[in-house]
């Protein structure tokens, strides 16, 4: 890990994050890969439709920039959901 950053602070049920925000900071840090994490204050780490869409978009942009998205982890109450472990994230083999 070369850098940990808070990109946004959301409300109880929403947060806005764009691939642009993620990858600008990744490029500035000279990152070779990215891991994204956020929490669900409800305690249920199940991904929302927006979480899944964001993961797909981050993966697409990461592939274009050759900075792969390693995982998108959602933290709940004493549990987590890994998009990679759930098979919702395909890591590009470059």
Positions of PLM-derived features:
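Hydrophobic "anchor" residues
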Residues: 1-2
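Active-site-proximal loop/helix of nucleotide/amide-processing enzymes and allied scaffolds
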Residues: 8-94
């Amino acid at each position: 890990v070369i850098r940990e950053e808070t990109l946004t602070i959301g409300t109880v049920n929403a947060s806005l994050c764009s691939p642009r925000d993620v990858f600008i900071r990744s490029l500035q840090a000279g990152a070779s890969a990215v891991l994204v994490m956020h929490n669900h204050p409800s305690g249920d780490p199940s991904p929302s439709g927006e979480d899944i869409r964001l993961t797909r978009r981050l993966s697409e942009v990461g592939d274009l920039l050759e900075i792969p998205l390693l995982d998108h982890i959602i933290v709940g109450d004493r549990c987590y959901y890994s998009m990679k472990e759930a098979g919702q994230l395909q890591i590009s083999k470059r």
